[in-house]
Regions:
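Extracytoplasmic small-molecule ligand-binding "clamshell" domains
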Residues: 27-111, 270, 275, 279
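Acidic, polar ligand-binding/catalytic clefts
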Residues: 75, 79, 86-149, 233-240
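A ligand-binding cleft/hinge motif common to bilobed small-molecule-binding domains
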Residues: 96, 113-122, 165-169, 173-174, ...
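Flexible hinge/capping segments at coil-to-helix
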Residues: 38, 138-155, 178-179, 258
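Short loop->beta-strand "edge-of-pocket" segments that line small-molecule binding or catalytic clefts
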Residues: 44-49, 66-67, 148-178
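Short helix-initiation/N-cap motifs at beta->coil->alpha
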Residues: 32, 87-99, 142, 181-209
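Periplasmic-binding protein-like
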Residues: 51, 130-141, 191, 223-265, ...
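Ligand-binding clefts/hinges and TM-proximal coupling segments of bilobed small-molecule sensing domains
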Residues: 28-42, 162-195, 227, 231-240, ...
Length: 282
């Protein structure tokens, strides 16, 4: 939908200082790769991003512009494909990002998309560009301090995320749950009731609102995302768990996959990512 998209020209990106992060030695995009040629002919790289994750990707409600680490990264990728290629951002959630790749509506997704063995069976992931860990945010008054204190509680998670499974696995690893009924390949937060229950939401602000209203007693997702919803009346439990590596996602077998992976490796090596992470306070 056009209302969820924003065109950001590379000229504007350069004015914002994005070009200073790019390597002066630019890899030439192979025009004989059909997916890359299609982007060059179109003049637009279609990218799925979050619109509410501070530091990674946020959409300004007035200007419609996207800013953040992943938005800058998308612009750098577009610049490598072609000097005149623009970025068309589409807001996605954990529940919608993969289907928009499958349908061909997006060329790639940069949306705090965690790399897992299961997901790699269905989509291509680049080398990780950021690592985080899952944590749990609670209200101070809840007296929830540890994983074990979540027994009997309802936890808010994002639909389509891996947070619920990671939490249950951590509780099993810490011998809080016996895990007899846990199957990682078939895990479904909607039907899991052993020790802890889950309520799935379409977006993070909805989980935060539910936590404030005590509709859920905990908010579980990656720590960098939870930091956005941390207030003086909220605390993190003591444990962090399940390291989460984020990668650029493309359709399985896409000719774009190897090209993007090469760029990620180059920028990891030349210090580009270190600068971007500092710039976005991550």
């Amino acid at each position: 939908m056009k209302s969820l998209k924003n065109l950001l020209s590379l000229g504007v990106a350069a004015a914002l200082g994005i070009a200073t992060f790019a390597s002066t030695a630019s890899a030439e995009a192979p025009s004989d790769v059909k997916e890359i040629k299609a982007i060059q002919d179109r003049g637009v790289l279609r990218v799925g991003v979050k619109n509410d994750v501070v530091g990674f990707s946020v959409k300004d409600p007035l200007s419609g512009e996207y800013t953040g680490f992943e938005d800058t990264l998308a612009t750098l990728i577009a610049k490598e494909i072609g000097e005149d290629v623009e970025v068309e951002f589409t807001a996605v959630t954990a529940a919608t990002r993969s289907e928009l790749i499958d349908s061909g509506d997006l060329d790639c997704v940069l949306a705090t998309f965690t790399i897992t063995p299961e997901r790699k069976k269905n989509w291509d992931f680049s080398t990780p560009y950021y690592q985080d860990a899952v944590s749990v945010l609670v209200e101070n008054k809840s007296e929830i301090h540890h994983l074990k204190d979540l027994l009997g509680k309802t936890v808010g998670v994002s639909s389509g995320s891996t947070s619920a499974k990671a939490l249950v696995q951590a509780m099993i690893d810490n011998k809080i749950l016996d895990g007899k009924n846990f199957n990682a390949d078939k895990f479904d937060p909607a039907t899991w009731t052993e020790g802890v229950k889950f309520h799935q939401f379409d977006n993070y602000p909805a989980i935060s609102t539910a936590l404030a209203a005590n509709e859920v007693q905990a908010f579980c997702v990656d720590k960098s995302i939870l930091n956005i919803y941390k207030t003086p009346s909220r605390v993190f439990i003591d444990e962090k768990f399940a390291p989460q590596e984020y990668g650029v996602v493309t359709k399985k077998g896409s000719g774009l996959s190897a090209f993007i992976d090469g760029l990620i490796k180059k920028w990891l090596a030349d210090g580009t990512f270190e600068k971007l992470i500092k710039e976005n306070n991550l």
